Regions:
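Short beta-strand-centered segments that line the small-molecule binding cleft or hinge
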Residues: 1-31, 36-40, 119, 129
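Hydrophobic hinge/microswitch elements
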Residues: 4, 68-130
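Secondary-structure junction motif
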Residues: 35-39, 43-82, 152-160, 170-176
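A late-sequence structural motif
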Residues: 129-173
Length: 178
């Protein structure tokens, strides 16, 4: 993912906020945890995630994003909403590092599905289960923000067009906002 704006900053400086994309959010886990039933395995994919009973997450190890990451709020909401007590939490700095740890079976993790490109297609298919949870979002908007009065407006508009026309369409599981 390029980034996300999950909170609109409250400040004296007027901002222009332009939505540019929507990215899929998934809970991913190594197949060894058995979160997706055998009869659902054939169809389980980032395009067809399994609706998971949150109780199955009790006492599992988690890969947690740092508080500065937009996914941290989703992680905290999940813990609070379902009363989940992780067996352990590994806090990572980079979501792709967390995905590699998840792939090795060290925990379950919320991700933007766009980062799945960082592991092989074979690992995506054979190693990981893909889930969504009731009452939690399965996507999030991404926006670009800039100061209303800036001399860089032509450059910003050009950058937004490049993002929408060249970069975002090449990201997995991410939709351009018209």
């Amino acid at each position: 993912a390029i980034g996300s704006l999950t909170d609109i900053p409250s400040s004296e400086v007027p901002l222009v906020i332009e939505p540019i994309s929507t990215e899929r959010i998934l809970l991913v886990a190594h197949k060894k945890y058995g979160l997706v039933p055998e009869e659902e395995q054939e169809h389980n994919s980032p395009d067809h995630p399994y609706l998971l009973d949150p109780e199955k997450l009790q006492n599992l190890p988690f890969i947690a994003p740092p508080p500065a990451n937009g996914m941290y709020r989703t992680f905290q909401r999940m813990i609070g909403l379902y009363g989940i007590h992780p067996k352990s939490s590994i806090v990572i700095d980079m979501m792709t590092t967390g995905l590699r740890l998840t792939k090795e079976g060290l925990g379950v993790q919320f991700i933007s599905a766009a980062i799945l490109i960082s592991i092989s297609a074979l690992d995506r298919q054979n190693t990981l289960d893909y889930c969504i949870l009731p009452d939690l979002p399965d996507s999030r908007p991404c926006s670009v923000a800039w100061r209303e009065e800036t001399e860089f407006l032509p450059l910003i508009h050009e950058t937004v067009e490049i993002l929408k026309n060249e970069v975002i369409p090449k990201q997995l599981y991410t939709q351009v906002t018209p």
